[in-house]
Amino acid sequence: MGLFDFSVKELHDKLVKKEISPFDLVSESFNRIESVEDKVGSFITLNKEAAFGVAEELGDAGIDPNNMLSGLPIGIKDNIVTKNLRTTAASKILENFDPIYDATVVSKLKNAQTINIGKLNMDEFAMGSSTETSYFHKTHNPWDLSRVPGGSSGGSASAVAAGEVLFSLGSDTGGSIRQPAAFCGVVGMKPTYGRVSRFGLIAFASSLDQIGPITKNVEDNAYLLEAISGLDANDSTSINQPVERFSNSLTGDIKGLRIGVPKEYLGEGVDPGVKQAVLDALKTLEKLGATWDEVSLPHSEYGVASYYILASSEASSNLSRFDGVRYGYRSPNATTLEELYTKTRSEGFGDEVKRRIMLGTYALSSGYYDAYYKKAQQARTLIKQDFVNVFENYDVIIGPSSPTTAFKIDGMINDPITMYSNDILTVPINLAGVPAISVPCGFSDGLPVGLQIIGNYFEESLLYKVAHAFEQETTFHKEKPNL
């Protein structure tokens, strides 16, 4: 049994009792990376020397018994800036970017005394659902190396599933934590918009982006979200909501819980194996005293179209800062200022990023603004209202995290529309801004299936309670890939 088979709480107890040291945990991480990284490709940049340095310092100082995360190894998605540690967003344009400050979540993790093992691979600028658009390399799913780990936080999910780190941070703009968590058989939480500071997150779509934790089990996830949540003066969209002790909600008692199951989430296009795993999960929840009814989120069908207009429009604006002037890649082939802009961006951005910038610029252009951007915002309002309506009568909404299990590498990369449609069950949650968690709920043809539990605003504690109760009745989260 490896050290990462233990939970956060178990490892914390061992550290406090000095049965193990932070150095042991960091060694475990890098030994595992040495063993499997060539197969999975979870990381872009490793932080080996600094990680061992922090581990030695913590070992000498002793573990704070009141600090649950002290001395534990974490991986961080490479669109979250880390001072003096290369942060690339998996793009050529930021290939050598060395940030001069830490993101707020990174500062919080340092205060919690976690140890950063390295920066994790992702789709370029978080634009993708497979981690295939990374400038550096493709990441492979630990359950089947011929398949994708999901995206855009594919490295964050694969590193946890492969046992390279104990837990990780990802970001979720349209499903980028929940879908890879589902594909890799781990737990991923997209918090309520504003629950976690975005300061230091390289922006894709500012009204949709949210940082969240990826872990092996629900309890670990709750501890990590506790550490990174809270109001931040550097992020005007962060919300002044008390930081809850999410871990206190894991009581196992869900008697009387009212579940809404959207008919749109189990209809055409959902793989039979995925649908069956979700229905089996609902039976498990019924045994625990919950009840469920079929409900409707009637405007879900407009989710993908609205999302790709709005997210691309915001990306068009956010990515205009990458111009070769202040930081990042600068084309050596430019002779005029105009050439500097055009060549830097055409050489520095990958195909998918350029596709979305062009789509967003088109949607924002004067002749098409009303027809596309404004219409998408109106659809977003209707999608949000759908959730409000259901939550008047139900405590949580449940469905699959993805309509399929992990697909083959190169299977969809040349078919953007099919790839985009894979987000159909996750983007409405970002458009509405509500929280959702993906937990392992079974397998289909040997590949993990994720159960998506969606809550009302700031009801992460309830999501953790439901997810934990389900997890305690099953063993799916204990299954490990054979690497």
Swiss-Prot record:
Keywords: ATP-binding, Ligase, Nucleotide-binding, Protein biosynthesis. GO terms for molecular function: ATP binding; glutaminyl-tRNA synthase (glutamine-hydrolyzing) activity. It is an enzyme of class 6 (ligase). It catalyses: L-glutamyl-tRNA(Gln) + L-glutamine + ATP + H2O = L-glutaminyl-tRNA(Gln) + L-glutamate + ADP + phosphate + H(+). Allows the formation of correctly charged Gln-tRNA(Gln) through the transamidation of misacylated Glu-tRNA(Gln) in organisms which lack glutaminyl-tRNA synthetase. The reaction takes place in the presence of glutamine and ATP through an activated gamma-phospho-Glu-tRNA(Gln). Belongs to the amidase family. GatA subfamily. This is Glutamyl-tRNA(Gln) amidotransferase subunit A. It comes from Listeria monocytogenes serotype 4b (strain CLIP80459). The gene is gatA.
